[in-house]
Design a protein with these regions (language model features):
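Bacterial C-terminal helix-turn-helix
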Residues: 2-71
């Protein structure tokens, strides 16, 4: 995983992607994937990521992530 990450970071730097943009996109994708893996269950996804439920809710709203499979 470390080698893949280093290659990705190198590519991003070459393309001029800024740190804040990279961090934001990583967080958005990471949260969306965890939420999908937990079938839209916000509490389970928050637990998987080690986030508080309120933080997870705020970030899902902030990034406008759709909760597929949510009841």
């Amino acid at each position: 995983m470390r080698d893949q990450l280093e290659k990705l970071v190198h590519e991003m730097l070459e393309r001029g992607i800024r740190y804040e943009d990279a961090k934001r996109e990583f967080e958005r994708v990471f949260i969306a994937k965890a939420l999908a893996r937990c079938r839209g269950n916000l509490c389970k996804a928050a637990d998987v990521l080690g986030l508080h439920r309120n933080t997870m809710t705020r970030k899902v709203t902030e990034y406008r992530i759709k909760r597929k499979g949510a009841a």
